[in-house]
Amino acid sequence: MKSKIWVIFIILFISVMSVNQANEFNHKTKRVPAEWEPQEATWMQWPGYWEKDNEIAFAKIADIISRYQKLHILFHSDQIYVDAHKALNDIGVDPQGKNIRWHAVPYDNSWMRDNGPVYVLNDDEIRIQNWNFNAWGGAFGPDIPFNLDNSVPDKVGTILDIPVDHIDIVHERGNLEFNGSDTVILNWSTIGDPNRNLNYNKKQAEHDLKEYFGVKQVIFIEGIPDGDLTKGHIDGIARFIGPRTVVVLQCTSRSLCRPDSKDAEIYNKAAKIIEKAGFNVIREPIEGFVNHKDLMFDTNYMNWLVGNGFVIVPGFGNPKTDIMAKSRIENYFPDRDVYLIEMLSSWSAGGGVHCHTNDQPAFSVSN
C-alpha cells in the first residue's frame, strides 16, 4: 500500500514539475526584442497640416533610415502624400526609393511611437499588440482627436498579415524600455495616471506587464519632469543600451533643472531604483538649455532612435551641446553611425525622433 502511495506521489510530483517547466518555457519564449536587435523596418506617420513644422525633420529622418533599412510611411490624405514627396525631393531623396513604402492609412497625429504597434514574439510567432490610446490621458486638451490613431496597429497588422491582440489598458510604447530578455522599465506616473487607467494599481500592472510581455522583472520609476505632458515617458528619462546597462538622465549646474531640483530628484531616484534592480547605470548629463519660440527647455538627448547600423538623435541647434552629446552616444553605440537632426519644433511639442518612429523587429514578415 505504501509503495502505491509513493508511486502516486512521484507521478503527481513529475506532473507538477512538467507543468511548471512548460509554463517557464512559455514564459521564456514570449518577449519583446530590444531596440538594438536586428530590425525589419521603421514606421512613421507623416505630419499633417497642424504639425507642418516637423516636416523638414521628418524628411531628414526618412533619408537616414532608408539608407539602412526599410521605411514604411503612412499618409492620410492625397495632400499629405504630395507634401511628403516634395519634402523628400527637396533634400535629394527619391520618395520611391527601394527601401521606402507608402500606405494610405487614416491617423490623427505624427507620434507613431505612442499609438503604433508593440511587437511581441510568442512561441516563434510574431504578434502585434494594440494597447488603448487616448492622446496621453487628454493632456493636450479635449479637442485632440485620437480614435484614428487607436486603429493604426490593426491597419499595420493587415498590411503585414500579422495577428493583432487588443489590450484593454491605456498606455503608450514611448513608456516602455525593454532589454530584450527579462526586464521592462517604465514610469508608473504614466501607466498609473487616472486619466489613462482609473483605479489601476502597481500590483495589477506588474501582473499584466509580465503576462503580456513575458518579462520576469518590471521596474517602475516615478515622477513627472517639469513640463512633460506625457507624464514622464521613460524614453526621455532612462534607456537601455545593452542587456544589463541603462543610461539615465542627470541634471547639472548648466541645465534648467538644477542638481537640487524636483526633476533632479526624479532622475536620481530612477538611477538608484534601476541600479538596485541589478543593472549598470550610466548618467547622461544635461549640458545646457535652449530658447525656441519663447519656450526654454533643457538639451535632453535621450530620445534617440536605434536601427540597423545607425542611431538618430534629436539635436537642439546648440553646436557645443550637440557635439558633446554625439560623442557620448557614439560611445554608447560604438558599432553604429550616429546622426543628429535639429528637432526643436518637435521637442517644443513634447518629443523627438524616438517619439515619431516605431521600429519593427526583424523576426516579423514584411510585405
Language model feature labels by segment:
Residues 23-367:
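The feature marks the mature, well-folded catalytic cores of soluble enzymes
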Residues 1-5:
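Positively charged n-region of N-terminal signal peptides that target proteins for export
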Residues 8-16:
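Bacterial N-terminal signal peptides
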